[in-house]
Amino acid sequence: MSGGEESSALLYFLKKILGTRRDVSLFAISIDEGIKGYRDRRITANIAESIGVELITDSFDEVLGKTIDEVVREKGDRFSCIFCKGLQGLVLNQIANDHDITKLALGLNLDDEAKNLLVHIFRGDAERLLKPADSLFRVVPMIRPFLYIPAREVALYAYFNMGGFEIRRCPYSHNTLETDVHSLLNKYNWRHPSTKNALVNLGEHLVSYGVMPLPDAGICPDCGEPCHGEYQEWGMLRELHHV
């Protein structure tokens, strides 16, 4: 849970449909990446409390011994999104396993998923395109209730049903491929309104077809978390501890 409109809307939505079920326990997870002035734990705590959901908090510094600010100071901000997203997934999965959580709900919307697909294409990352992360051993399965909902509609849902969230842009996002793709996709989608839906559908089909053999999952020798192929989170950890 970031404290923004997407994660706030998701938590409200899940509480509304699952809150009365005795066989389901709902938790919110907040991870502090260590970016000065970007995360305010009080905001996420207030949102979780107002909805009536227990909040689990952790940070890159506590789990990995490094913050994104420290990484950027040593390596620059060009690849900050790669480090941040990869390590977020690692820490999130670790928290879920530690607390016996059986499903992780993500606030990713249509815009996010379409952008991520294009980023993987531009980077030539076939493994991320063709093999879902939660197919790996010990990776907690993920659900994305807002997958086909445009970002604007998710934001409206949050505004109409609750408040207290923040809209804050990461200070390192200005120099990343993700930001360029986001801008490019929005401009193209303005002229061709079905583009984002088409990209998300393409991504779903690519995963289901499994058009190329991919390496089996392994266990990271440094952190004990699952990894596969050339994209391994333990490689990030090694880099972090050598910056």
Residue spans for each PLM region:
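ATP-dependent adenylation/nucleotidyltransferase module used to activate substrates
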Residues: 1-131, 135-139, 148-162
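ATP/NTP-dependent adenylation/nucleotidyl-transfer catalytic domains that generate, transfer
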Residues: 25, 128-243
